[in-house]
C-alpha cells in the first residue's frame, strides 16, 4: 500500500468515505453569491465576529503544553525523556503542579508501546515521592503499540480517546507506533503527523493534547527522521543529559514565547525501586521546586542517583 493509499484509508476510517482522490474540475458559473449551490467548505468559514468569539489559547500546563495541540518530546536513549513524559502524565492526571507550573487536571491515556512493567515502579515512586495517589480512571495505560500507519488501528484509537474523554494522550514511543513507515520520508511522516492531529480532534472539544515521545538522531541533539515531524507539530521539546543534569528545552511553540528551559535531575525515593524528576538548579529559566506539602525538603537533602537507574 502506498503512502497515498494509507492517507486515503485513514481519512475514510475517521471521516467516512473521503470521495475521489482528485477533485472534479472547478466550474465558475459567474453568478457569485447568488449561486444556489453551497460550496463544500462554506460551513467552515469564520467571519470576523466568529473569529472574535473563538476561545483564547489556554494551557494544559502553564507555559509548557497548550490545549488543542500536538507536541513532541525527543532525546537520545538514556536522557530521561520517558521519565519526563510519565511525570507530565501523572501531574495532569492528578492536577498536581508540574515542576511548579499550574496544571489543569484531565484524564490521561499513556500508550506504553515498549511495555508497561517499568511503569509500575515509576508510578509507585511518583505517588510515594509526591504524596499524591493516582486513582483509577485518572491515568490509564495501554500496554502495547498502536500502529498509526494502519487505518483501522488509528481509527480504533481515536474511538477510544473520544469514548473515554482523554485530555492528554502520551505515545511512548512514536517509533514503535509507526511500524512500516519510513522515518526519513517526508510523505510518510506527514501522514503520521496528520493522524496525530486527527487523534487530537477526538479529545474533548478537540482541545486535548497529543504528546509523542521520539528518539534523537545520531548526533543526539536533533530529531530523528524527517523534519516534517517538527514542522507539523505545535510544540517541540528536546531532552539532553549533561553529566548529572537533565536539560529539557523547548525548540518550537506555535503560539507564545518559545524559550522554556528546565534543569532537572532524578532522585531516588526511599522504599521504592525508582525515582522522581526534580529541579536540579534554581535559575531564572527553571521553575521553582516542585515538592510541596508533607514532602517539602531543603534542596539537595536527598542523594541523587542519576546513572544507577534505567532512566530512558
Could you say what each language-model-derived stretch is?
Residues 2-67, 79, 129-136, 142-143:
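Core recognition of P-loop NTPase motor domains used across DNA-transaction enzymes
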Residues 65, 110, 172, 233, ...:
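Conserved RecA-like P-loop NTPase ATPase core
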Residues 39, 49, 55, 60-61, ...:
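Conserved inter-motif catalytic segment of the P-loop NTP-binding fold
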Residues 91-105:
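Post-Walker A helix-loop "phosphate-sensing" segment adjacent to the P-loop in P-loop NTPases
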Residues 72-73, 78, 82-83, 168, ...:
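Phosphate-binding/switch region of NTP-binding enzymes
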Residues 11, 21-25, 30, 35-39, ...:
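C-terminal regions of RecA-like/P-loop NTPase motor modules
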Residues 84, 88:
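Hydrophobic positions on the alpha1 helix immediately C-terminal to the Walker A/P-loop
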